[in-house]
């Protein structure tokens, strides 16, 4: 909500991004993109927040969830509380070879950034906006 307000992102644009995101995710599942990237666990085989049948009209009917008076964030256009369940295992090339692990990728570039959210000088989620361009310059 804070980022949307700070950057003047209107509700309809947030809903449009949410809609497009659901459509792209549904297509990726249909095309088998995640087949070798996801491991089913406890009966869950797909992202449980995917709504492939959603429409912009349905999204527009949802009420704001954080700032009920003036807010624009809804259950559909904000990050779900269950989002973010993932795992990345990193190891040295030497260790991977010694343990007969297949090397799938190399971490070649990284960057660190922080924002001053405590004093409300910058948005909480803005660190990647600083880090990613610097990292891409290195690449």
Please report, for each region that a protein language model flagged, where it lies by residue.
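A general structural-boundary detector
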Residues: 1, 46, 76, 118-119
């Amino acid at each position: 909500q804070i980022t949307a307000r700070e950057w003047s992102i209107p509700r309809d644009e947030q809903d449009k991004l949410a809609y497009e995101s659901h459509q792209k995710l549904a297509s990726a599942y249909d095309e088998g993109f995640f087949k070798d990237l996801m491991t089913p666990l406890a009966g869950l085989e797909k992202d449980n927040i995917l709504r492939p049948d959603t429409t912009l009209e349905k999204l527009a009917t949802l009420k704001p969830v954080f700032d009920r008076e003036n807010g624009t964030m809804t259950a559909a256009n904000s990050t779900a509380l269950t989002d973010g369940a993932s795992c990345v295992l990193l190891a040295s090339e030497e260790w991977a070879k010694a343990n007969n692990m297949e090397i799938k990728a190399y971490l070649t570039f990284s960057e660190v950034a922080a924002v001053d959210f405590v004093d409300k000088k910058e948005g909480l989620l803005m660190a990647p906006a600083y880090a990613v361009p610097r990292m891409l310059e290195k690449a």
